[in-house]
Amino acid sequence: METFEVTDGVYGIDTGLFGGSFTAVYLFDDDEPTLVDSGAAATVGTVLEGLRTVGVPPSDLENVVLSHIHSDHSGGAGGLLEYAPDADVYIHETTAPHLADPSGLIASSREAMGEHFESMGEQRPVPEENIVSVPETGTTIDIGSNALELVYAPGHSPDHF
């Protein structure tokens, strides 16, 4: 696991998914600590270690912004909320229901990923009260001295921000 500073107050957390350098999680260490993506369920421990490395207790996490629903980017959200139960989880409105009930997502991921599926870990549901369903335009998240503007950018995934 490697945690590195991208710019002042922004850190990358290399989750090590698939056995290599695979950075899929970024921390904005601001008044409201915010993760962009959660990583896969199998990497929750690595993400927690990354938070602690930069001095952010997991329970202080205020927001998790998921760029899209693919398991390597969103699969760890439910597991992270066991350590940050008050965090809001932002996701595109079309895929928000898959966070509360990931059974359909798990089935389609298993089919699409084949033998690699097991390396993603067991995806846990995100409590509905933590989910913030985001429309395609107009959402800005104030995190303190910075703000994150969510820009709808479908392509890699139809729900991509």
Each model region followed by its residue ranges:
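Active-site metal-binding motif and surrounding structural segment of the metallo-beta-lactamase
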Residues: 44-91
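Conserved beta-strand hairpin/beta-sheet module of binuclear metal-dependent hydrolase folds
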Residues: 2-54
